[in-house]
């Protein structure tokens, strides 16, 4: 009987040791292959799925040299166009003459033809302002002399016979006015003052709320947006009007909003980063970009829809050139602002932060721990959210190992509490009860 009891204890101890060894080998495999497992798990998800969930669809910060090169090329083209081509300034900046009269059934092409036959040159612009019975034809041209203005009014009256307030054809229905070039200059001066005040307030807020490196990155991104938008106007030849100047100020607000969204997530991900070795600062910033990527895209799409509606109303329904100029600069600014907030501002922030001693030391610690082959190092090898299941599995296996290693000595010592499902073990040194009352006294 004693030999059977000893055999039972040996079997349980052997089972516990085998379970511990199997669990430890599973943990070792998990530690050695965590990066491979993470990559295989991410491989099962499509690009759009990873893009939507923010689990590392884009490597932006890691390729920031590429994006800096692209951004630098864009800025270089914009500056070259501004320097060599210049801008197409509207009448408000160059000065000129405006002639208007009730539309009636007049078409733009007819007005342009009458203007050319009367003065021998093309008008700067001919637009239909308003709709219905109150619609008017507005002609903008270079500064005309009084004789040229009178000649043009006569030609327009003979061709279209615009009606006055009494419903009868009248030359008084045709009005003209001179626009001074100083008016556009005054608007530009006020816009520059507003821009400087805006940048100062933005710099103060971001410095107090976040940090100075984010301030430098955000201000640089806004200057990038202004330069590229102005370059597009110069390259394509869009007319620069006071509405364009006002639109440039409005896109700064959108660009800043989109940039702050990403920066807020970066600040959240990197809070206390120096106390952990899971990811480097650059990897945390790249994760923040991916986590806010869809939010930025959705914000841009929602911002573009009313701008497109404004352009539709301005061009096809009302024919208001001012609204068209305002909507056009906003459309260009939204596209450029979305690009800069993702591919320029955050990579620039990472570049500035990596010049600090704190971030450099932390990056060296993370890389050193990864290269050492420790479980934490292999866990840190991945830089996206998809590694969390592997880490959870590893922790579960470690817990099983600890429990098994503790149960093995208890089994070897003959614990009075057998494991569930284990074969009952008879205590050593005891005899089978006989069922008789005084059997033990014999």
UniProtKB/Swiss-Prot annotation:
The keyword Cell membrane applies. One of its GO terms (biological process) is intracellular protein transmembrane transport. The chain crosses the membrane at residues 67-87, 187-207, 218-238, 243-263, 301-321, 331-351. It is a multi-pass membrane protein. It is found in: Cell membrane. Part of the Sec protein translocase complex. Interacts with the SecYEG preprotein conducting channel. SecDF uses the proton motive force (PMF) to complete protein translocation after the ATP-dependent function of SecA. Belongs to the SecD/SecF family. SecF subfamily. This is Protein translocase subunit SecF. It comes from Mycobacterium tuberculosis (strain CDC 1551 / Oshkosh).
